[in-house]
Amino acid sequence: MSVGETTSAPPTPAPDSDVITSTFSLVDYVVFSLLLVFSLAIGLYHACRGWGKHTVGQLLLADRRMGCLPVALSLLATFQSAVAILGVPSEIYRFGTQYWFLGCCYFLGLLIPAHVFIPVFYRLHLTSAYEYLELRFNKVVRICGTVTFIFQMVIYMGVVLYAPSLALNAVTGFDLWLSVLTLGIVCTIYTALGGLKAVIWTDVFQTLVMFLGQLAVIIVGSAKVGGLGRVWDVASQHGLISGIELDPDPFVRHTFWTLAFGGVFMMLSLYGVNQAQVQRYLSSRTEKAAVLSCYAVFPCQQVALSMGCLIGLVMFAYYQEYPMSTQQSQAASDQFVLYFVMDLLKGLPGLPGLFVACLFSGSLSTISSAFNSLATVTMEDLIRPWFPECSEAQAIMLSRSLAFGYGLLCLGMAYISSQMGPVLQAAISIFGMVGGPLLGLFCLGMFFPCANPPGAIVGLLAGLIMAFWIGIGSIVTSMGSGLAPSPPNGSSFSLPSNLTIATVTTLMPSTSLSKPTGLQRLYSLSYLWYSAHNSTTVIVVGLIVSLLTGGMRGRPPNPRTIYPVLPKLLALLPLSWQKRLHCTSHCQDLPVDTELFPEKMRNGALRASGDKEPMTEASPVHQGTSPTFILHETSL
């Protein structure tokens, strides 16, 4: 079956008399309320525990003492948004299981951050990922990266709060602004008062709720249609089970190559350089714990993706046996799954409430991460560098005030989203357009020692211009033809680089159209290649400008900010080849300069020498200007 096609016809709608009236029972309201109560209680507990003794490090980085498992679940929850929970099943229902191959990109998409980005960030003892840009380039590049990230996340958090609330209101009659205000206020309170530790532990709780809610739908739905075997048989009979589509054309929406390799760049923009994720790595007790938490996300992501796909298959099998109402058949894609769940779980008190709790757990986890990361970068990148004399107490109060301020801004953005109408789709897509250029900026600095500040700035601007040109062009072209666009840099499971793009992607038609030409051909580039395209633009333009402006002009970059790509690749060769290439001739005899990795506080300030972290084997250390890199490991 080719991508975007399905051999099955939609089930015949039932008469209008069968329209579903989805109402919550008292038990459902209790289950949903417990989610809010427990989330708030976790935040207040961490806020009250040690009140008056908190430090900025505790508030923003959980005092760098978090374990592997909570960090891993928080990494998963951060971009497992509510719209993703609605978007994946709808994608599978409409287009088949081709989307499941996105799971193939998770391996490289998490392996590279674990062994490239985490070691560099962790050993620099950063608080903000954008502090790296100042250490590698200069303060101007740091501010450019920070402002770009703030723009991305401010749009993201308003839409991720409003969109699922709107879908829930349309299906269940749940008051729209009551749910928006309740979620926004609860999330703001526990994030601002409890800091990152509260956010991580509420993410753990909310992740469990998300899994339970989806599992309930799978169990009840498969039982009603005769079991998972029957679900699979029905899907196979109707051509919903997709084979591997090996078409290399990057303009085809979903193929194996697009999902498995284009998705890698999307994952890198999320799990490699996004502040919300980097902050969690840096909160780990040790570098090893940070790496293990990144590994642990892999099976969790596979489970989350598989559950979403299963719900889509169960939904398809269910509607082959039970006719849907006209109201359901005409529903928007972000409402379609909710109609199915309310139809499926009616008469089972508590389960509709559990799924709604699952849905809003996705919203809470993503919004709280946005608040916390925005407060962190604003404090560390825009305020502290200009007010270094700010006391600890003032910094704590300011950090909490920033989180509260971003919470109010989130509510304002939710209101603006409600007024945007069709433009909302463009606002959603902006999040995905920004992820690729930011990834390219970090890769430019980390992998290319010749890159200089002018190259970084011009490269970032070129990447953003290219991203918005193609992304907005795709939206306008699709609107002009009456079709939903293929959103940039999105995927149904994670939205940062995708957000509610998951919902938008499912609106694509199931029939092939004539091939576009000219600029329309460029605008039809698969959204999963956007991160790769835009990050490559930043790197290529950045390198050209850097070379034209003289590179680093004899001022080599700080070796701690460069990832030694060539020595790492040479290390993969057989030992005999390494000896012939003379890449191991003297690496065992050089001394380790522990001063190259002093423990650094915020904004480049160094701790007293007595507080430095001891060095043992394992960390990649560049010995002065020598081209040789030696492996050492910090005792973390």
From Swiss-Prot:
It catalyses: biotin(out) + 2 Na(+)(out) = biotin(in) + 2 Na(+)(in); (R)-pantothenate(out) + 2 Na(+)(out) = (R)-pantothenate(in) + 2 Na(+)(in); (R)-lipoate(out) + 2 Na(+)(out) = (R)-lipoate(in) + 2 Na(+)(in); iodide(out) + 2 Na(+)(out) = iodide(in) + 2 Na(+)(in). One of its GO terms (biological process) is iodide transmembrane transport. Residues 606-627 are annotated as: Disordered. It is a multi-pass membrane protein. Pfam families: SSF. The chain crosses the membrane at residues 24-44, 68-88, 101-121, 143-163, 176-196, 199-219, 256-276, 297-317, 336-356, 404-424, 428-448, 456-476, 528-548. It comes from the Eukaryota. It is found in: Cell membrane; Apical cell membrane. Its main location: membrane. Keywords: Biotin, Cell membrane, Glycoprotein, Ion transport, Membrane, Sodium, Sodium transport, Symport, Transmembrane, Transmembrane helix, Transport. InterPro entries: Na/Glc_symporter_sf, Na/solute_symporter, Na/solute_symporter_CS, Sodium:Solute_Symporter_SSF. PROSITE patterns: NA_SOLUT_SYMP_1, NA_SOLUT_SYMP_3. GO terms for cellular component: apical plasma membrane; plasma membrane. The C-terminal tail is important for biotin uptake as well as apical localization in polarized cells. Belongs to the sodium:solute symporter (SSF) (TC 2.A.21) family. PANTHER family: SODIUM-COUPLED MONOCARBOXYLATE TRANSPORTER, SODIUM-DEPENDENT MULTIVITAMIN TRANSPORTER. This is Sodium-dependent multivitamin transporter. It comes from Oryctolagus cuniculus.
